[in-house]
Each structure stands twice: as structure tokens, then as C-alpha cells.
Amino acid sequence: MSVVPVVDVLQGRAAVDSEVTVRGWVRTRRDSKAGISFLAVYDGSCFDPLQAVVNNSLPNYQDEVLHLTTGCSIEVTGVVVASPGEGQSFELQATAIKVVGWVDDPDTYPMAAKRHSIEYLREVAHLRPRTNLIGAVARVRHTLAQAIHRFYHENGFFWVSTPLITASDTEGAGEMFRVSTLDLENLPRTDKGAVDFSQDFFGKEAFLTVSGQLNGETYACALSKIYTFGPTFRAENSNTSRHLAEFWMIEPEVAFADLEDIAELAEKMLKYVFQAVLNERMDDMQFFAERVDKDAIDRLQRFVTSDFAQVDYTEAVEILIASGQTFENPVSWGIDLSSEHERYLAEKHFKAPVVVKNYPKDIKAFYMRMNDDGKTVAAMDVLAPGIGEIIGGAQREERLDVLDQRLEAMGLNKEDYWWYRDLRRYGTVPHAGFGLGFERLIAYVTGVQNVRDVIPFPRTPRNATF
């Protein structure tokens, strides 16, 4: 018995007239008056289900086959034949059906064969991968992750695993989840009444990381080209379609590189992974184009063939002011560009992906390299039509004296960053990197509007059910 995935049968990799077995779940069952049942069987290996044609001559036809409902798990053995019907090239002429698992009560099965609202699916996140939408998202997520690893491997980067528990606040924003084993009912106190974290597990305050960047820089300053790819955490009380408390980040870091180098790297990487999705997941992308966002495929195709525009922040502000547009957030030099500003630049003005660079120092993090004008830092954002910011990056401040000035200006204790400062004391080099939120990337590719629907189990304010 040859067990094969559904995708192998549908794509002709299982020989016609060969007998194979597929294992999966029933999506639908349709019975004809001629005593034949048609089962749509899916196993997640591709978007489309496989049609299994079941004759009433099978010994368990009356007692089992006719009682199969959506969600039942089965094992189908049969002969691969060319399909006379529309919708698939091949189907399975069943010679045996084995029921592996029944649905207890089909009437109350949360994933009954009908369209469900996206809000309802979040309430049954443990079952929602069985839907067309979330199944397609999961496969695209996988393909993007594999393409990211492949891109960096092919370009000489090393993957570095940075810690999830940290004592450093990379962004200096303070929106971090605390990690502690102290007894909340009996907290140890210092003489001044503050919580005594010296008695905690790590002997100091510890948090879930907001970024692997600082740790990544240490390896870039030894291996030259590295990237991190893992979960990060933000304790922002933001209930928006763009925010998660737990999300995944890709963060490359390159030694002997400047802002122009990583802007070029960002463009190459995005085009590479988008092309991978177009090459490998067209069945899922067609579903997104039909049911979610009609521009899904065309958007990626335009992106991979577009030249990125580049503009200084100062010029971008001038463009926005001169546009005559009325923005919800007024535009002036020194503001952090909002999503509406970013989308105007990418969609209306440049009509292409755009790199905005050299932002005011007061709205950026302490580690970004001060420019010669003393007012701006060598930071960049990549803005994409349809979403706005998709990547944020910078050249890092490699001069110890300037870094110390920035830490002091932002009210951060430089002794807390002693190991980070050591990189500037022992063979410092110019280096640069960026961060890419993986869920925002998936949302952009699929057209799914809310990042809660592109991660298996979203963590948001007041929600950690599963």
C-alpha cells in the first residue's frame, strides 16, 4: 500500500491506474441516485481536496460511508483515474474506505460546511486551520519562512538564535512583559520598599524580548552576516489589526555595511520571497485573489518587477505638505509618519515601494547612527503600496562616545548596556540591519486584513485562550 499526499494525486505524481492510499478529512459528501457517493477529501498538502468516488458495492457503504460528515477522518484506498468531471484532473476510484475518526455530533460541529465569519473563527482557533482560509494562510506562512531561510543561506548569512528572556530594552520604550518567579503574594522588598529583584530567578529584572537586534549585533561583529528569525513580545495595549503581543521577526545584521547596503538587501529579500510564493503557492494565491483580495496576485507581481524609490524623510515631509491632501494626522518636520502618510507616498506619489531614510533623531532609537547634521539618524523604513511600513532598519552607531551621548539623552543607564558598548571598544565596525514583522509580511501577501488571522494562536490584550 502506497500512502501519498493529496497534492501528489492532483498534480499527477501518482501514476494513473496505480493503487494508492490517502489519509485526510471529509470536506463534503455528495450522494447520487445511482448508488455512488462523492467524497471531497483534504489533507492540507494543497488547497484543493481530492474527489474519491465510492460505489455502493463497498461492504461498509450503507453503515459507514453514507454517515460520513464534514470533519470525519478517513483512509481511502483506490485507483488513480483521469477525472471526467470539471475541477480536477485526477480522482480516486475507491476500493476501500476506513473511518478513522467520527465527528461526535455533526449538528454542533463548529466547522460545519458553510462560510464562517473571521471573528467566529478566532473563537475556535484550535479548529480554524481546517477552513480553506486558514489552511491557505498556513501554507503561505510556511513557504515565506522557508524562502526567508533559503535567501539568507544562499547569500552567506548565518542564522543566530537570540534569547527570548532579556534584561535589555532594545527599543527603550518600556513596553515589555516581565519574567519573574517571585511570589506575588509575598514580594521581597528592599530597604526603600521597592521590589527586590536580586532575589528573583535571574538575580535582576528580566523581560521577554522585544527584539533580537542587540544580541544579533554581537554575532554580526564576528560572523559578518547574520539574521535572527523568532518570536518577539510587546506589552502594548493595542487592539488594532496591525498589532500582536507575540509576533515573529526577521532581523538581519551586516558588518561593514551602511544604510544603502541594507536598503538594497531589503529589496532583494522581499522580491525573492514574494517570487517564491508566486512559484510555489499559486493555488492558495488564487483563492486569496478570488475570496479575500482580488489584487493579491497582481500586487506581488507588480512588487517583484518594481524598482524601489528612495527619498529622504525631509523631502517626504515636503511632498506630503505639498500634496494638498487633508490628513488625519497633520504633517510637519519631526513627526513620526503615520500609516496614512506612508500609504500616500507609496500608493499615490511614487506608485511603487519606497525607502524613506534619514529620520529625525528624536523619534528614533538610541542605537541608530547620528548623521553629520546632528539632527537626523541613518534610519530607514520600507513602505509598500497597500500597507505602508513593512520594514524598519538603520545603520548602527559604532562610535562609543556618540552612543553614550545618545543613551544619556534618552535617560538610559549606559551601565545596563555595558556588553553592547564593548562592541564599540573592541574592533568596532560600521554595521547595519533591519527588522521585518513576519505577520505583517504574511498579511501583505495574502490580503488578509488582520494580523490575528495569519498567526496560529494570536496573543492580544485580554486574549491568551489557546
From Swiss-Prot:
Fetch the InterPro entries from UniProt.
Aa-tRNA-synt_II, aa-tRNA-synth_II, aa-tRNA-synth_II/BPL/LPL, Asn-tRNA-ligase, Asp/Asn-tRNA-synth_IIb, NA-bd_OB-fold, NA-bd_OB_tRNA
GO cellular component terms, A-Z: cytoplasm
Pfam families attached to this UniProt entry:
tRNA-synt_2, tRNA_anti-codon
Superkingdom of source: Bacteria
Catalytic activity, EC: 6.1.1.22
> Which keywords, in A-to-Z order, does the entry hold?
Aminoacyl-tRNA synthetase, ATP-binding, Cytoplasm, Ligase, Nucleotide-binding, Protein biosynthesis
Q: Name one GO biological process term.
A: asparaginyl-tRNA aminoacylation
In Gene Ontology terms, what is one molecular function of this protein? ATP binding
**Catalysis: reaction(s):** tRNA(Asn) + L-asparagine + ATP = L-asparaginyl-tRNA(Asn) + AMP + diphosphate + H(+)
User: What CDD domains does its record include?
Assistant: AsxRS_core (cd00776), EcAsnRS_like_N (cd04318)
Q: Gene3D superfamilies, alphabetically?
A: Bira Bifunctional Protein, Domain 2, Nucleic acid-binding proteins
Compartments, record wording: Cytoplasm
To which protein family does this belong?
Belongs to the class-II aminoacyl-tRNA synthetase family.
Which HAMAP family does the record cross-reference, listed alphabetically?
Answer: Asn_tRNA_synth
Instruction: Note the subunit structure.
Output: Homodimer.
Q: What is this protein called?
A: Asparagine--tRNA ligase
UniProt source species: Serratia proteamaculans (strain 568)
Q: What is the lineage of its organism?
A: Bacteria, Pseudomonadati, Pseudomonadota, Gammaproteobacteria, Enterobacterales
Q: What gene makes this protein?
A: asnS
